[in-house]
Amino acid sequence: MIHRKASLKGLSRFFLLLACAALFTGCATQSPTASGGPGSSANPAATTDKKDLKDVRVQLSFLMQSLDAPLIVAINKGYFAEEGLNVSFERGFGNADTISKLGTGKFDMAFSDMYNALEFNEKNPNDKVIAVAVTQNKAPFAVLSLKERGISSPKDLNGKKLGAPAGDGPRKLFPLFAQEVGVDPKSIEWTTMEPKLRETFLLQGKVDAISGFSTSAIPSLLKAGKKPEDITTFYYTENGLDFYGNTILVKDSFAKANPEVVKAFVKAYFRGMQDVIKDPTAGLDAVIAADQSKLMDRQAEKVRLDIALKSMYVTPEVEKNGFGAADTARLQETIDQTVAGFGLKSKPQVADIFSDQFLPPKEQRQVPPAAERKPLS
């Protein structure tokens, strides 16, 4: 569903009414932004008049999810307002669509991946987009099956029927995955379906496995009654394709015209990320409370956030380099793999798609010490 935009003040009043009514119920997709909110600090910046702030329009990669907790926390606690920004957001309709709309100038910033952006840039050289920070150090690209199908290793996929939507990123990259794990891609029979039917096809036995994002597929399969031990997951990042996940993307022309705005956004976002790492339950609660549709499944969102916390947000690379950075050699290798997997004509270099000049100093984007991190509950 399409979600309405709201001012930072509007959501503050919304939360105040909830508190007065002793209600703090779960919601389901996404509401727009606000300064202040549950748990926000009593900071003058959090109540700065919106007319004094720079409006920044953001598009998510999909519906608002627990993976967006850093953004929601940064909004609620007034971190963007402290940097002079009034951030509003809308849901997305998939990574590729989000990038396309960013390129048209409908949004100032977006959350999506660099690899679809490479393809977009080749087709739209005059509307080039770039990544200014990595938000997910590991991509959730995966092939998933059920134990009952007898697929216990990637090689067991030979001759099987796989399912995914036509534009699915992991599906487009599957030939590279197959090459890494010893599967003949020509032996695979692909079935195409709508994204919302992907897990259903697997559950009904119409396909032997699916490609997609683990953060989407696993919560759906668990909600359908499967147990974690029933699900077999082959991550691309564990099989020779060490892709980064989502990033903060901006149009290149916007970044050049508004460098301080981009820097301010990135700085505030990673303050939110640090808070989520310290207290993921509070981050999850903030997302649930921010959604106005009241359809969000807290347990499914908890599973989604748990996956991100364990394998996407904090990795040895992030511990070493801080949030937002990218390893040049690793990124170039994945760019080269994308060129091959997507059949791109150009051969981009790291500087063509990623810039670290908008990141705050490393000391401001460090991973919180383990002793300061609460468990997700």
Model-derived regions: residue spans:
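Short, glycine-/small- and polar/acidic-enriched structural segments
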Residues: 33-194, 199-204, 208-215, 234, ...
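Short helix-capping segments at alpha-helix termini
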Residues: 79-83, 180-185, 224-227, 293-297, ...
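Short linear loop/turn motifs
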Residues: 88, 96, 192, 235-236, ...
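Surface-exposed patches in mature extracellular/periplasmic domains of secreted proteins
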Residues: 90, 129-131, 190, 276-286, ...
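Secondary-structure end/capping motifs
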Residues: 257-343
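Conserved C-terminal helix/tail region of periplasmic/extracytoplasmic solute-binding proteins
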Residues: 328-377
